[in-house]
Amino acid sequence: MDHAKAWIRSLWQSNIWIACNALALHILVGECLGLTPDWTTSFVVFGGTCFVYNALRYRVRNDEDASAHPIVAWQVSHYKVSQALMLLGFGIAAIGALRLPLSILIVLFVAIGLVWIYMRFLRAVGWLKTIIVGVVWSIVLIVPFQLAWSLDEVLLSIMIALFIIGLTLPFEIHDQTFDSMAHPAMKTVVHRLGMQATIRLSIGCFVVVGLLSTYLGMVSGVIISLVCTGFVLQCHEKTPESHYYFLLDGMMAAWLMIEWALPY
């Protein structure tokens, strides 16, 4: 039983669920563009997301300040799970990437470079990590579709980036105590702006997402921006951890389900 619980916890903490949500958002973007994602782009998105987030988990084992904290101590003691899933994710992404044009691969390598900066200089990037996360997600979800980059497509990419940033900002509130203990020199958005300003910034991102969705004719985007705003308003220092995980890990798939549920 303990072994089974350990594996369930490994899968949860290894962000398999985030990779599934990334795939859901990729499918949503395809529907907005009138395209159907094939297995190639799906492999890149799912495998790439799984690789990156497990690489971040695997990196923690070399950080003495972070690994000493009880929140990540379990991850450090089971780092081989993250290592295995990281390699599996890389293999899945590589299989899909083999069928993509060179021009698309070059852009994806730019995203990989941004992730490397985030991983290598985690303490130095501080508040910039939120922007890096949003930009990288937007690139990975949209670029594989090989677009001509019309105005609507550019606005869609901006909307996705803001949506991800809006989801990430509340998690900065959730992580502020851990960040202060594990990375005393790192100044995140919450450390620089304060909790209330961070919440307002997150809501501002969702307001812009709603406005861009209105312009692009995406009713589901307007609905999800309102839902996310409601969840963000409930965030504070004592908010249960499950609230943050549902907000971050559930809203991407929820957006796709809302899109499918609408009668048009």
Annotate the PLM regions.
Residues 37-55, 107-113, 152-170:
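Membrane-embedded alpha-helical segments that form the functional core of polytopic membrane enzymes
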Residues 20-25, 73-85, 131-147, 190-198, ...:
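Small-residue-rich segments of transmembrane alpha-helices in multi-pass membrane proteins
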Residues 5, 53-66, 114-129, 173-178, ...:
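C-terminal ends of transmembrane helices
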Residues 45, 49-84, 165-206:
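Solvent-exposed interhelical
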